[in-house]
Amino acid sequence: MKVRNLMLSLAFIATGCHGFAATKGDKHMRGEVKLDGSSTVFPIAEAAAEEFQKLYPRVRVTVGLSGTGGGMKKFGSGDIDIATASRKMKPAETKRIQEAKIEYTELPLASDGISVVVNPSNTWATQLTMAQLKQIWQPGSSIKTWKDINPAWPQEKIKLYGPGPDSGTFDFFTEHVMGTARLSRSDYVASEDDNVMVTGVSKDRFAMAYLGYAYYEENKKLMNVVALAKDKDAVIPSPKTIEDGTYPLARPLVVYVNNKSAQQKPEVKLFVTFLMQNVGALAKEVGYIPLKDAVYTETLRKFEAATGGPTQQSH
């Protein structure tokens, strides 16, 4: 996603037109907030970091991009304050983090729909069934050309792009398409950077990829989205179909906050408060589907209860 271009629209938020809440704290506060993890959550986290640093220029907020799995490893090692994730924490990750005696709070940010995309000149693959998607991506797949999927389609090799194994998108996609997480063919171009997939699909008429909805929305002139059919009619991802769950690959986006970091570092607690007060507007601006306001209010209450009460603010 072109995050820098995105910040032009985020400047509009800062005027208050989208209910942007300028959380008040010590303008001279110093410190560092470290986030790492999901490439899907990255646009929200990066936008929040930039807006927060306009208010608190002496606080350094770093946002890493090592994939959900990579972020969880760093979170479990105590290397970061916040892990960003495009899926729920796995049992093995929970166990490792608990063994490290790290207490945390899970905070929902928004909803997303993993989008299957093709080149704009692809006029044949307008929709796929979930069964066909499984045939394409299963280990040892016999699908090599478009004609292998449908006899009426071109006998041209499919160039596949997708997230790498550290990605939460990879985990969620394989679990919901294959029925087993991390089960996938390996002969595809794998990357933790969604822009690699955008570029690959936009330049190859016979390419296919899957990525977060915000990356499709930001680059829709460079690719077509494929409608997916699970039981009956094929459905394309949109704010409505993702929110109501009719799109087959709708999923949650979350962050995990180290409670000790929030308790001992006021800049971390203030950043999380700022994030949760503004994430609805930020999510919408970057192309994801915001949750209900009541969810954010309850989430912030839960976070404050876990970390010693409301953020202390000064004017």
Task: Go through each PLM region and give its residues.
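Bacterial N-terminal signal peptides that target proteins for export
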Residues: 1-7
